[in-house]
């Protein structure tokens, strides 16, 4: 994925009530609301390494904000400062590992979480309403 951008057009459709989005282990000190962001994984055939898993930092949005309109998220794989690993370390801090991971991407997609965690899952508070997440476009293109 070296030299590539990934973008996704996402939205939420409310189907009843006023859904309140939650995340696993809520509340936490970090306070980040239930969100969606990009994720990629490199080859994990060896022992577990924090730097095998990466999440976009800025290219993210809250599920609450998607109730009022669709958004397009975009992130550059060539920008290590736009990503953090499983342990929360920036791609600039772990530059060698980030560069190696980008050269050997095995999976790329979207991840849902909140609080201090980008991957802990999200849901809707019981009795608050109902909604569904929409993915209208997911594209990987060369960086301009």
Sequence positions of predicted segments:
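Extracellular beta-strand ligand-recognition surfaces/modules
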Residues: 78-132
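Residue-level signal for functionally critical sites in structured catalytic/ligand-binding pockets
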Residues: 37-42, 129, 134-136
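Short, solvent-exposed mixed-charge patches
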Residues: 143-144
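Extracellular ligand-binding interfaces
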Residues: 9-89, 113
